[in-house]
């Protein structure tokens, strides 16, 4: 459903960028306005974000098996994604204080957290093959499986609400909650070593659905998600 819903609701996203840009933006040191002498050059801010992304990624040991060119692209994707998501997660009617360090927290309400969740799912899917012809199970769903599927079903409704209200923070929160739910699901229930092949296939398909929604939603926010991190 998410592919058609994205096409159907894209028109609602044409004008919200102007609403976001009209909100007050501050750094921890003060407002980003030239009349107060604290204007921040966009290129400098982006460079800083990419640098912070590189530092955090290296500290977490997430740079193995990457070529140098791939690392540069990854740092840029994380840094710019963190900046965009931090700005878009706030109600456009409210004042926001942008903290570069906070925006690249891999465990918080941030773009990198969602990007990492997507990459984690893609890693699982690379190691396990989905049998597209497998039948739907008759046994009851685990509570976490059901909760994830229910939240996935809310994607179309969330797109409509966010587009109608010109408020991308609605979508940002939805994606964050979905990523949180998946990580709880991933920690509690085995996918690769599920209790049966049927359960394994079910969880792989749920994981694939979550990854697709995360990628689609982030792209609507103008943010790329890496295939691996």
Segment roles from a protein language model:
Residues 18-229:
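Non-catalytic interaction-recognition regions
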Residues 1-21:
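Single conserved hydrophobic/aromatic residue that forms the stacking wall/gate
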């Amino acid at each position: 459903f998410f592919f058609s819903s994205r096409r159907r609701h894209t028109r609602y996203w044409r004008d919200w960028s102007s609403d976001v840009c009209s909100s007050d933006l501050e750094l921890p040191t003060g407002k980003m306005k030239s009349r107060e002498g604290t204007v921040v050059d966009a290129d400098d801010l982006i460079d800083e974000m990419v640098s912070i992304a590189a530092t955090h990624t290296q500290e977490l040991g997430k740079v193995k098996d990457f070529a140098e060119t791939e690392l540069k692209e990854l740092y840029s994707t994380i840094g710019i994604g963190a900046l965009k998501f931090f700005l878009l997660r706030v109600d456009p009617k409210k004042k926001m204080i942008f903290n570069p360090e906070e925006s690249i927290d891999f465990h918080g309400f941030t773009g990198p957290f969602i990007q990492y969740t997507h990459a984690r799912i893609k890693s699982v899917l690379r190691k396990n093959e989905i049998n597209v012809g497998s039948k739907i199970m008759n046994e009851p769903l685990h509570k976490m499986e059901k909760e994830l599927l229910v939240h996935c079903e809310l994607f179309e409704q969330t797109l409509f609400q966010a587009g109608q209200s010109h408020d991308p923070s609605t979508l940002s929160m939805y994606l964050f909650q979905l990523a949180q739910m998946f990580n709880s699901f991933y920690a509690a229930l085995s996918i690769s070593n599920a209790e049966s092949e049927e359960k394994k296939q079910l969880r792989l398909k749920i994981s694939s659905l979550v990854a697709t929604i995360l990628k689609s939603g982030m792209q609507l926010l103008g943010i790329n998600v890496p295939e691996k991190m």
